[in-house]
């Protein structure tokens, strides 16, 4: 099982490039402290125009250790100070979840992210279908992962 933290950041109009630069700096700091970090531009569907900063961890302990370490890093704190003085976007999250099937094997240049809402009682049937879906998607080099929130809001 692995864990994921996702921040959804919507840029203020005309501030996309500044926001991208800041998020790239933050992502690099997170990487230095143990996260497998990727920054993605949402190009279609719900949230188009925003950025998703995704961090992946092999264990919950690794996630907590990383959160504490990058939060204390002077480079991270500097970007947060700049953000407070000159905000260029709105941050939602992090959404924190655990992967119950699959996990990214590496960062990909394109990610297709779909959200489905299901009751916990439906998870066994979903997990039964996952290998079949993964087999279908392998022919187009798409990884399949299923995550559930650790905290429901």
Task: Identify the residue ranges that each predicted region occupies.
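Short S/T/G/P-rich N-terminal loop/turn motif that feeds into the first structured element of a domain
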Residues: 1-153
């Amino acid at each position: 099982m692995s864990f994921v933290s996702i921040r959804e950041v919507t840029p203020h109009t005309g501030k996309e490039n500044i926001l991208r630069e800041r998020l790239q700096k933050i992502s690099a700091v997170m990487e230095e402290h143990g996260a497998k970090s990727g920054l993605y531009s949402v190009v279609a569907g719900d949230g188009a125009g925003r950025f998703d900063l995704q961090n992946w961890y092999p264990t919950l302990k690794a996630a907590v250790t990383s959160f504490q370490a990058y939060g204390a890093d002077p480079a991270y704190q500097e970007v947060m100070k700049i953000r407070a003085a000159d905000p260029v976007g709105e941050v939602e999250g992090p959404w924190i979840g655990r992967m119950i099937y699959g996990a990214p094997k590496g960062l990909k240049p394109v990610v297709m992210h779909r959200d489905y809402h299901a009751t916990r009682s439906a998870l066994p049937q979903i997990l039964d279908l996952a290998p079949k879906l993964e087999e279908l998607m392998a022919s187009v080099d798409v990884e399949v992962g299923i995550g559930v929130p650790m905290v429901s809001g």
